[in-house]
Amino acid sequence: MKSAVENLTATRVKLNVEVPFEELKPSIDAAYKTVASQIQVPGFRKGKVPSKLIDQRVGRGYVLETAINDGLNGWYQAAVQETGVRPLSRPEVEITEVPDPSATDGELKFQVEIDVRPEIELPDYAGIKVEVAAAESSEADVDKSLDELRGRFGTLKSVERPAKNDDFLTIDITATIDGEDIDSAAGLSYQVGAGTMLEGLDEAVTGLSADEEAIFETTLVGGDHAGESAQVKVVVKAVKERELPEANDDFAQLASEFDTLAELREDLAKQAADSKVVEQGVEARDKVLDKLVELVEVPVPDSVVEEQIEAHFNPENAHGEGDHDTEEHRAEVKANTERAFQNEIILDAIADKEEVDVSQNELIDYIVTTASQYGMDPNQFAQIIDQSGQVPMMVSEVRRRKALAVVLGQAEVVDSEGNKVDLTDFVRPAGEAAAEEAAAGEANEEADVVASDDPAAVKF
């Protein structure tokens, strides 16, 4: 078999494939067996019909067509391996020549057009310079954290006054189009200012007391009437405010392991400082990635964008957002898809150059972390991703993160005050940090999760 690559664009190629008759013959023999098992001829057992009789009954052309259809994917995959292209889209195949059915020689020729991963040229990424905000926490940050903690222990109390921002309401709503009620709901709980229901609702309920109502115009964002303008009547049934417990030593003992408010505030101050450092690292990471995308031109195949948009807005998809299918939303999905693709291509290229690999420990760390984000047991989550064939995808994700950490570790990062920012802890692999903790006797075992570099020790 011979194959050659013809570059059509930076992201699309045409494979020209030639399969000689001697390589086609095994598929023809297999096709005869397939056809023999499908037809019945008096005097012959099923599957034992001679080739010549099959030619008489269904024609050798049909057998040849079956052989080509059954073998095409294998020859395509062989051509991909031979040429080294990395397909991104479904192949578009055109058969340009087939052997004469009446002859015992000739060639099968076909062409395949596919989108492929683009080849890029990496710039010198060592010493990329970025500026981030200074990691400064304040008493205001501590007060905010303390108020959030108090809010978790707060209680709701009905009040006899007009509603204001942050109040909690019980409301009934009815949506009307052209005088016809098209939807309604009663007894809904809503926090003023949350902005999680209908546009215009916050303005409508602000200033209303219990048993008062308002009517406002809005554009519906879901259901059968998504995108249509509707008149909405909202009736406030109750207005409540959240009472926060007093911040004192008693509260500190209730809400934490500390005995005094001073100790609790000290701990919250440390958390705020640590959070600012993490925010600084995240900002540096994002800006370094922005710089990489600026430095490298990565063409994005149309098929990548089209498939993502189709999946995103497919109403049959559990995660589809058909109700929000607008030009603005499509443009947003397109931009996000293009950026994600560019990130992947650049980071994969850096990982190749830096010879980044992924250890079993690092993969398990990532699985455990991801499982916790979904609120799942790590072992159960690992089993699910293994059964769905997503382990290679996760390995690639860890590899890209490590590649970005390499670039970030070589970057020159300063804060807004000109101070050099040390990102050592931020870019250090989680497995390395865990190893240090274990050596110091501080590591906690992950329940029932094996962490080993021995692949046989991990059961997915």
Curated annotation (Swiss-Prot):
A GO molecular-function descriptor: ribosome binding
Record-linked Pfam families: FKBP_C (PF00254), Trigger_C (PF05698), Trigger_N (PF05697)
InterPro entries: PPIase_dom_sf (IPR046357), PPIase_FKBP_dom (IPR001179), Trig_fac (IPR005215), Trigger_fac_C (IPR008880), Trigger_fac_C_sf (IPR037041), Trigger_fac_ribosome-bd_bac (IPR008881), Trigger_fac_ribosome-bd_sf (IPR036611), Trigger_fact/SurA_dom_sf (IPR027304)
Biased composition (Low complexity): 449-460
Claim: Signal is one of the keywords in the record: no
Keyword Membrane: no
Any one GO biological process: protein unfolding
Catalyses which reaction(s): [protein]-peptidylproline (omega=180) = [protein]-peptidylproline (omega=0)
PPIase FKBP-type domain segment(s): 166-245
UniProt entry keywords in alphabetical sequence: Cell cycle, Cell division, Chaperone, Cytoplasm, Isomerase, Rotamase
GO cellular component: cytoplasm
Origin: domain of life: Bacteria
EC number assigned by the record: 5.2.1.8
Location in or out of the cell: Cytoplasm
Region called Disordered, residue ranges: 434-460
Function per UniProt: Involved in protein export. Acts as a chaperone by maintaining the newly synthesized protein in an open conformation. Functions as a peptidyl-prolyl cis-trans isomerase.
Family listed: Belongs to the FKBP-type PPIase family. Tig subfamily.
UniProt domain comment: Consists of 3 domains; the N-terminus binds the ribosome, the middle domain has PPIase activity, while the C-terminus has intrinsic chaperone activity on its own.
Name of the protein described by the UniProt record: Trigger factor
